[in-house]
């Protein structure tokens, strides 16, 4: 399977951790966005939305990290522990995945990306949205070791990729006790966290 990615990208790193958890070897293809490689005709033919991560499994192409994670588990998982078949458990996992995409990671992108890529000043109102997102996550984790149930799922891997990116950006989430406790545990139990952290440090260069 070909996997088009950037190591600094949190969505890409969440897929890499999922593949590691499943014991899948991906043929990693580095895509240089700054050089416009994602806009070349050969890549647009694979993914007309020209985004990363993008997975190519035979004649099937898929993008959007959370969709890729679920696809890999459903097709290649030896069991359903990362994405249980129980409708209620699966619904909670999906909610957490959508929360990551639409609230938590979005708050990161909205606050930090203009500063990184457009040299814009920090917006205190957008900072408050990041704090609100962490408040929600902290509430979700009340009384729970994992973000969606009693064991590690794709929701943990997606949120771990995001939260570790907040860490290298310098966002202090220590005051969110449940998040801090979950993060400390998730780092030790998530397969492939070392590679995830290497990608985080790559991304951190944007802040130097």
Curated annotation (Swiss-Prot):
Keyword Iron-sulfur appears in the UniProt entry: no
Entry keywords, A to Z: Transferase
GO MF annotations in UniProt: glutathione transferase activity
Binding-site residues, glutathione: 9, 50-52, 64-66
InterPro entries on file: Glutathione-S-Trfase_C-like, Glutathione-S-Trfase_C_sf, Glutathione_S-Trfase, Glutathione_S-Trfase_N, GST_C, Thioredoxin-like_sf
Any Pfam family the entry gives: GST_N
Domain GST C-terminal: from-to ranges: 86-207
Enzyme class, first EC level, given as a word: transferase
Subunit field text: Homodimer.
Catalytic activity, reaction form: RX + glutathione = an S-substituted glutathione + a halide anion + H(+)
Domain GST N-terminal: 1-80
Enzyme Commission number: 2.5.1.18
CDD domains recorded: GST_C_Delta_Epsilon, GST_N_Delta_Epsilon
Purpose: Conjugation of reduced glutathione to a wide number of exogenous and endogenous hydrophobic electrophiles.
PANTHER family reported in the protein's UniProt record: GLUTATHIONE S TRANSFERASE D10, ISOFORM A-RELATED
Family: Belongs to the GST superfamily. Theta family.
Name of the protein in its database record: Glutathione S-transferase 1-1
GO biological process: glutathione metabolic process
Keyword Ribonucleoprotein part of the UniProt annotation: no
């Amino acid at each position: 399977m070909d996997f088009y990615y950037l190591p600094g990208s949190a969505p890409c790193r969440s897929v890499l951790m999922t593949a590691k958890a499943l014991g899948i070897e991906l043929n990693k293809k580095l895509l240089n966005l700054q050089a416009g490689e994602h806009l070349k005709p050969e890549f647009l033919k694979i993914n007309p939305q020209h985004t990363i991560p993008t997975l190519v499994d035979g004649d099937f192409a898929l993008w959007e990290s959370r969709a890729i994670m679920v696809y890999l588990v459903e097709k290649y998982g030896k069991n359903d522990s990362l994405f249980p078949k129980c409708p209620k458990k699966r619904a909670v996992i999906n909610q957490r995945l959508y929360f990551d995409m639409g609230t938590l990671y979005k708050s990161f992108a909205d606050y930090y990306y203009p500063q990184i890529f457009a040299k814009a000043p920090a917006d205190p109102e957008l900072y408050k949205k990041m704090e609100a997102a962490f408040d929600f996550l902290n509430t979700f984790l009340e009384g729970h070791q994992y973000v969606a149930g009693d064991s590690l799922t794709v929701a943990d891997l997606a949120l771990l990729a995001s939260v570790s990116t907040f860490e290298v950006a310098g966002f202090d989430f220590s005051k969110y006790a449940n998040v801090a406790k979950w993060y400390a545990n998730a780092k030790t139990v998530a397969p492939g966290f070392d590679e995830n952290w290497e990608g985080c440090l790559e991304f951190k260069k944007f802040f130097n």
